[in-house]
Structure formats: C-alpha cells, structure tokens
Amino acid sequence: MTAEYKVQGDVAVITLMNPPVNGLGLSTRIGITDGLEKANNDAAVKAIVITGGGKAFSGGADIREFGSPKAIQEPNLLSVIRACENSAKPVVAAIHSVAMGGGLELALGCHYRIAAPGTSIALPEVKLGLIPGAGGTQRLPRVIGVEAALNMIVSGEAIKSEMLAMLPGQKLFDAIAQSAESLPEEALALARKVAAAHADGLPMPLVRNLPCKHPQGDAYFQFTRNMVKGMAKNLPAPGKCVDAVEAATKKKFEDGMVFEREIFMALMMTPECRALRHIFMADRAASKIPDVPEDTPKRDVKSVAVIGAGTMGGGISMNFLNAGIPVKILEMKQDALDRGVATIRKNYEAQVKKGKLKQEKYDERMALLSTTLSYDDIGQADLVIEAVFEEMGVKEAVFKKLDEVMKPGAILASNTSTLDVNKIASFTKRPQDVIGMHFFSPANVMKLLEVVRGAKTGKDVLATVMAIGKKIKKTSVVSGVCDG
C-alpha cells in the first residue's frame, strides 16, 4: 500500500508514499480510506493529517494507471474525497511542494488546509483536453472566488501558495507554514487546535457548503466564454471549464458535481483529448532512457558558456538566462559580439513592450549575461555549448581549444545538426564529457531539444543534459549518432 499510517500522540498522520509525485493510484487511494477509517475508530485519535512524502503532496492522478481499470476502481478519487468530508474527526491537509489536479481536489475535500510557502497549486487538466473531474470546478471557486478559480482552471497554470493566500477573502488555506521544514509540526499543531474546537460537536467546515456567486452573473460568464473561445484554438476543454464553473454558481453542489462529471466523461472521448494525452505520454516516455536510471548522479550546472553570438548562439543563451542561469558568450570579434547582445536585448524589449515580460525580469536576465573575446574567460563554466559554423574543421578547432581551457568535469556540448558527435568527441581527451545539444531555430522559441548521445558520452552527462533540458523548458529527446 502506498500510504503510510502513523499516530503521533493524539493525531493520526496519513502520508502518501507513491513516488515520484505521490500519484493517486488505487493503492494510494485505498491507503487513504483505510487510514481515515482506522483513525475514526481509534478513540485516542482526535484529528487526522494527510500529507505527502518525498517531493510532493500529490501531483494528481497516477499516470501509470491511465486507461486501466485501476483508474476508476473503488475507492475512486470522488469516494476518497467523500470519506475525508464525512470524517467525524477533523482532517487537515498539510500541503507542500506540489498539489496539482486530483492532489488539489483531495486537499479541497479536507476540512482544513495548511501549506508550505512556495507550493505550486494547479488544476492542469485542461492541458490534457479535460476539465477537473473530482470537484475542482465546484470547490475551487468557493474558496478563492469565481474569477481567480476560472483563470487557474482555464489556463492550467500553477500559482504559488503564498500568492493565493493573499487573495481577499480566500478560504483555500487556513495557514501558511513558516517553511517547508516546519510544516509537519505546524500541521500537527493546527490539527490539535481544531480538534479542541470540535470537541463539543461543532460541525466540520466543508468547502461544498460555502457560497459561490459572481456579482455580474450571466454577463461575466458570457464575456469570459467569448474571450476563451478566441484563445482556445478550437479545443473544446477551455470553454467547458467556463460551463462547469458557471454551474457552480447556479446549481446545488451535488448537481454541479454531476454536471462536472458529465463534461469530464464526454471530453475523455474527444479526439482532441486523446491526442493531448498521447502527446503527454510520449513526452514522458521520451525523457526516460532505459540504461540511465532516474537516480543517476547529475553534475551541477550553475554557469554556461556559449560559443558564437549569432542567431543560434543568442537564442540558446536566452534559454538559460530565462531559467536564471548565468551565461557568458564567446565571440572572436567585438562587432559580432555586440550584434549578438543587441539581438538578445531587442528580443527581450519586444516581450516587455507586449506585456509578456516585466521590466525587472528583463533587467535580471540581462544582468546574468556577460561576454568575452577570450577562451581563457570561459574555462570555469559548468557547461559550454558551441554554436559555430557547421563545418567539421571549425568544430575541430573549437573542441581542441575547449579541451585545453575547460575545467575537469565541464560538459562540452555541440549544437551540430548533421555532423558526427563521435568525431567531434575524438578531438578531445575527454570524450565522456562530450554530447550533442541540437536546438532548433529560433532556439529561444522552439520546444524541441535533440540530445545526441555519443558512443563514449557518460551516463551522468546524459542525465545532466536531460535535466537541464527540463529546466529550460524544452522537450528533450535522446538520439544516437545517425541520420534522421
């Protein structure tokens, strides 16, 4: 069973233990309901805390069970949430790191919620062509307001816990912990406090009982529906999110839940949903390398050097600047360097002008950028990426020089799209550190990153580059040294 049950004094703690993100698979769901039953039958237990072990509270559904009978087998998530609501003893969700999809819906079914600062909160189902299917569209508007909830549900984007806690009148969090480290103790303290408050039979607070209205009613939803329609690119799910949240303001809670479930099941059968789920699963599969375990040690990459300030070099640099990683660009001539930096600056200024980037973020990113005309100045970089002319003689000169100046353990990457990475690696005395990182043009826009594994590329180098790809928000796909 992938949920752990322990009693700490007079509080039962149910810890989700289904790495990597505590997906709510069948075994985990059974563990939660069994834990709730055990706690309610133990006279010594006065309150219950549900939390997540490892790196997440819960990332939602267990993708390993997508499309299998286990995904809907009882207790399904709706039943688990109902068990939380019906608990005779207060249930506190202690949320940290990530609470997404079904994980957030589970927390919304608890009587109280405390979150660590920096926790990512989201209902991302729209990105799979769906709407939340376990009460998210009905409960979230009741705790943060209709507009804030609809923005989250339609976009599917994550918002940090401390930002949500600042919303006027929010009832999503009863407390924000001082830190992730102090969350367990603060959750126990909250559980004991609310247990004392309910000792005399005070009814449990249920999100489902909170009011849900919007002052502009129909006019607001029609405006929102029109706006979403223009942005949805013919995908049905965003518009259906609006319908479901509108139902939360007009229907009784149970009727709204039925309406949400009907929409969810109908969307599951659409070609758009099937396609988006296929893309999601393919993206996940592409990140897994059979002979490179997930726990393979990775090298620290805290600084990057890019050789070449042209179109590719500038675009590559922006990816790392966007991720908060310092970049030093090397060129042979000052005018080429100046043109490259000017292009980067122009690209960022265009984003600022369009309102896509705040001025302070622009300033932060440009402050991370430095330049040089000397190889000697890049030797301490953790990763160096060459983006020079696509000719083997040029690559040979570059990599022989990198072999001389780069510190031990630095990763030497080539942006080549056609040349032999094994041949390039042979120009160095450290072929285990050489790898291909083929960005597609424009490199700061295109999502795909082709990671070319040479015959002698180290597993730690490959694992590191795949992790870097994720950090700079690329879809990384491993290829061999071959055509195609």
Where are the language model's segments positioned?
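Amphipathic alpha-helical segments at domain termini/boundaries
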Residues: 1-16, 105, 109, 153-262, ...
